[in-house]
Structure formats: structure tokens, C-alpha cells
């Protein structure tokens, strides 16, 4: 049985990724590591230099705990996760959004990227392949609504923001916490919706167990 470490910078990421594992890889043994000080220290600007070492430390702890694969669920820390992956090779270490990006880009169309945390949009657009037709949108107030448990306001703000992306061919949801609106987006707009948890679980399963 594969043991998978899920590393979180916020508790809101835990329910959607655990649901994705139950649906797509129920036999995996998952362990959760939560350090919400990462989110508190992230801010909306550039990543603080000391942040990378903190991620490497978390990754090494997960590896020492017997993890066969590691998935970071925090989308605003791409360079830190890349450094951790290099440090722990050959253990598979995945960013939360890399599989979703590959799937969304495979369509060849214009991608509407929805995010609720400003820090995500300082790093994530650069992770898309050069030449990608990308239209990012920050949904102000939605993440704060989610944190206080106001799911309806969160969902309504996301759906309203998506109206500005009607010229896009697909929607890409930048954060795990946005996966809760995937079905609502498809129902309203009829466009493909790429969600980070499901894409990440499929990719990590292949990386850990091989194809099949």
C-alpha cells in the first residue's frame, strides 16, 4: 500500500483532496501535514527567501515518515515545491497544479484561470507553457468568505467572476478549495472545468505506482 503525504498551508485544502483520494485512489494510505504559518507568512508579493528551506524541511519530514509520494496542496509556493522535489528525488513530489495545467493546456484553447488568493497569481501563471492563451482572474473576497464558513458567498463570487471569462474555452481552478464550484461552473457555462485535486491524484498515482 502506497503511503502519500499531503502537505497543506491551509486547512481549507484538506477536504477536497481527501475527497479526490476517496474517489480516485481509495487504497492509498494518506497522511496530512498542516502548517498554516506558511499561509500567514506568504503574503501577496514575492516569496520570502527563507520559505524554501521550510518547504524542504517539511518534505524531508514526510520522507522520513515513510512517504512514497508527496503532494503539496498549496498553489502559491511553486518555486519552493520545485526545490523540495529536487532535494527528495527520486521520491515523487508534486505541485498541486502541475497536472491540472497539463490537462488544461492539452485542449489548445483559451484558458480562464480562476484564483481566490492573490499570492497564487504571482507564481502560477509562469508555470503554464510559453505561449499559453491564459486569462487569469482574482476573485476578491471569496477566500475570506470560505475561511469564515460562508460557502454560498464564496460560490456566488466565483460564478460572478467567471462571467468575465465567457470568451475562454475552458476553466482552470487554481486552488484546491475552488474544486467545490467545478460542477456549478460546468452547469452554468457548459465549458470543461479542470480542477486541481482530481488531476493531482491521477498524476501522483501514476508517478508512484507507474502506468496502469
Set out the residue ranges of the language-model regions.
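Non-catalytic structural scaffold of enzyme domains
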Residues: 1-212
